[in-house]
């Protein structure tokens, strides 16, 4: 029934799903573009009314927020949950209101050949934006950017330099959001007040919300470079850079494209909206610890000259480009034709006080820890991370499995037509934003969905097929914890990603069973699918400072012993068809409260404050040993980051 209905709908969905208008280039400054950051303190107010609709009924967006009632100072970027001492805000579900007043430079408001854009890095989960009380933009889904041209609202007269931006954000998760959730009304009035409800989620991290990434204004000319798509290839020692450029605001234009190397020397140039640049003797983009000069980046400089009704304009945009190839065989993952082994981590965007708020000191610390560990990869579990994170990966050579917020797809009712269409749109937004990052080598469309369900099989097939159509240049996967014989989505992936928690959630305490159970799992999956396998999660909850020998659960010794048991099997299988291992997790992180979570998930090899547990040293020794093996050229580990290696 369900599959049949979908089979009929399939072509319709397909036709309307490629619906995204325009590009989402990262806002960079250039000769023709300016940025004005709106990070800092915003006015904030949560709507605590029973129906959460008071802000709309009283039209809080029509005048300054402080006139509607008491407001708080709220830092942006940050989650709002951990900032105040109000327990209601910590657990709030519903609409919150943010507001910021800014003064624009006159050249933005008076020069009609300037286009002014408001960009929001992310707002979790549904956002409505007003500028000077005028409804401007709505966006569904956290973790991804959205923007609006607000020129006609700010170029309207002598007082137009004063701009008031109001953003209402709702963090409620329903059966059609990504991630999904359910709202449960508790009606037993002997226990609960009237109208009492809770938000149920089906994933293991705290549902932080707010303006968690930067908000900014930027300008372009009225005719502008709207999007650039780059794919790269290698023929012998010549690098190939294929580009496609879209221009908006003019039909009369010329494009010049220049490719510069890291020393700013011109290595190739071209013209027009698409073409191929050839780079003889190209320096390839290699992962960290795979080459003595990893992460080599070129710059693609695009120059637009266009005719508009107001006369000629020019626009400039520079895109970092890494020349590299990715391929998958039945037992290997190849980067630039060489076998690549993922030795890395799963992460979360999570820290004390700021929650999921973007933070430069934290980001740089995390990258220093990744390099210290000898990690060459991570997965963006379980949502796309901030754009600045991926830019760091490009620069440091850290390989990324880029995951969308398809987590917690645990119930049959979550696999419906509306969700499917929403999921496909989200994949379009992810690919549109992240397609040009050389560090991104694979898309992940979901984490631990209920993939044994018939409806899930069709759903995953549609999302994966759609993602491959959006970007044929990268493999696509989802991360499974289903049984190999029951998984309905696995036939459609390029790489099998397996989560398993032997002797933690299953046969807990029995470390002696891990080798047998893990070996059986790998062999069953490989026999069935003949595809490379990544151990995409494994680990143990560890309270720092708990010690016991022989090892007991929750101690540092147990985490180490569990890892060692996994590593015995991983060492046997990585010589065959296992192409990676990602520990769960890089650092401890916050979850919903439950009797099994002691102030969050404690499976990190670092604490939430980024200090090492015993297992971090074990993992570091292993990752550097793998990196130092003979299959990488010998000079590498010596010349690269000597201070990081435990063996120097």
Curated annotation (Swiss-Prot):
- Record-listed E.C. numbers: 3.2.1.31
Tell me the active site. 448 (proton donor)
- Annotated organism of origin: Chlorocebus aethiops
Family affiliation: Belongs to the glycosyl hydrolase 2 family.
The gene designation is GUSB
Q: What is the top EC class of this enzyme, as a single word?
A: hydrolase
Signal sequence span is 1-19
The task this protein performs is described as: Plays an important role in the degradation of dermatan and keratan sulfates.
Protein name in UniProt: Beta-glucuronidase
Please verify whether the record's keywords include Signal.
yes
Q: Where in the cell is it found?
A: Lysosome
This protein's GO CC annotations: extracellular space; lysosome
Record-level Gene Ontology MF annotations: beta-glucuronidase activity; carbohydrate binding; signaling receptor binding
Which residues get glycosylated? 170, 269, 417, 628
* Entry keywords, A to Z: Glycoprotein, Glycosidase, Hydrolase, Lysosome, Signal
UniProt cross-references to InterPro entries, sorted A to Z: Beta-gal/glucu_dom_sf, Galactose-bd-like_sf, Glyco_hydro_2, Glyco_hydro_2_AS, Glyco_hydro_2_cat, Glyco_hydro_2_CS, Glyco_hydro_2_Ig-like, Glyco_hydro_2_N
**Chief subcellular site?**
other
Q: Name one GO biological process term.
A: carbohydrate metabolic process
What Pfam families does the entry give?
Glyco_hydro_2 (PF00703), Glyco_hydro_2_C (PF02836), Glyco_hydro_2_N (PF02837)
**Regulation of its activity:** Inhibited by L-aspartic acid.
């Amino acid at each position: 029934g369900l599959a049949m209905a979908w089979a009929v709908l399939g072509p319709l969905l397909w036709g309307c799903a490629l619906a995204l208008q325009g590009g989402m280039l990262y806002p960079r400054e250039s000769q023709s573009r300016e940025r004005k950051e709106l990070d800092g303190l915003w006015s904030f107010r949560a709507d605590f009314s029973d129906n959460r609709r008071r802000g709309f009924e009283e039209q809080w967006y029509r005048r300054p927020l402080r006139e509607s009632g008491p407001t708080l100072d709220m830092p942006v970027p940050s989650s709002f949950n951990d900032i105040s001492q109000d327990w209601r805000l910590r657990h709030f579900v519903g609409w919150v209101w943010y507001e910021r007043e800014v003064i624009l430079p006159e050249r933005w408001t008076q020069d009609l050949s300037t286009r002014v854009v408001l960009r929001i890095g992310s707002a979790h989960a549904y956002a409505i934006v007003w500028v000077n009380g005028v409804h401007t933009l709505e966006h569904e889904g956290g973790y991804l950017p959205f923007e609006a041209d607000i020129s006609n609202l700010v170029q309207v007269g002598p007082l137009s330099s004063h701009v008031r931006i109001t953003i209402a954000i709702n963090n409620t998760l329903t059966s059609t959001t990504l991630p999904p959730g359910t709202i449960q009304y508790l009606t037993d009035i002997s226990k609960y007040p009237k109208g009492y409800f809770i938000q149920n989620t089906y994933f293991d991290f705290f549902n932080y919300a707010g303006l968690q990434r930067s908000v900014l204004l930027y300008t372009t000319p009225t005719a502008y470079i709207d999007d650039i798509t780059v794919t790269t290839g290698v023929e012998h020692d010549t690098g190939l850079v294929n580009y496609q450029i879209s221009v908006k605001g003019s039909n009369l234009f010329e494009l010049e494209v220049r490719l510069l190397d890291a020393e700013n020397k011109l290595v190739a140039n071209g013209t027009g909206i698409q073409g191929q640049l050839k780079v003889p003797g190209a320096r390839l983009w290699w992962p960290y610890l795979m080459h003595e000069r990893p992460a080599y980046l070129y710059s693609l400089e695009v120059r637009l000259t266009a005719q508009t009704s107001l006369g000629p304009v020019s626009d400039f945009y520079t895109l970092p480009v890494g020349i590299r190839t990715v391929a998958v065989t039945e037992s290997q993952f190849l980067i630039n034709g060489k076998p690549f082994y993922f030795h890395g981590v799963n992460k979360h965007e999570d820290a004390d006080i700021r929650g999921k708020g973007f933070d430069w000191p934290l980001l740089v610390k995390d990258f220093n820890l990744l390099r210290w560990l000898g990690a060459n990869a991570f997965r963006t579990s379980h949502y796309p991370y901030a754009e600045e994170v991926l830019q760091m990966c490009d620069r440091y050579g850290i390989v990324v499995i880029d995951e969308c917020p398809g987590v917690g797809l645990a119930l049959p009712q979550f696999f419906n037509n509306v969700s499917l269409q929403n999921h496909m749109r989200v994949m379009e937004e992810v690919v549109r934003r992240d397609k040009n990052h050389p560090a991104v080598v694979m898309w992940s469309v979901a984490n631990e969905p209920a993939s044994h369900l018939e409806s899930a099989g069709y759903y995953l097939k549609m999302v994966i097929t759609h993602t491959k159509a959006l970007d044929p240049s990268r493999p696509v996967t989802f991360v499974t914890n289903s049984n190999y014989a029951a998984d309905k989505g696995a036939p459609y992936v390029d790489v099998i990603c397996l989560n398993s928690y032997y002797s933690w959630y299953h046969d807990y305490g029995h470390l002696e069973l891990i080798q047998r159970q893990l070996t059986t799992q790998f062999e069953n999956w490989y026999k069935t699918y003949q595809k490379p396998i990544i151990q995409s999660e494994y680990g143990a909850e560890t309270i720092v400072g708990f010690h016991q020998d022989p090892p007991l659960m929750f101690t540092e010794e147990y985490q180490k012993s569990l890892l060692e048991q996994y590593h015995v099997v991983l060492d046997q299988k990585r010589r065959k068809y296992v192409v990676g291992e990602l520990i769960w997790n890089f650092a401890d992180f916050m979850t919903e409260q439950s009797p099994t979570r002691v102030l969050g998930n404690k499976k990190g090899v670092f604490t939430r404050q980024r200090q090492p547990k015993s297992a971090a040293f074990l993992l570091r020794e292993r990752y550097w040993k793998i990196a130092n093996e003979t299959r990488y050229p010998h000079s590498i580990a010596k010349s690269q980051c000597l201070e990081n290696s435990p063996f120097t």
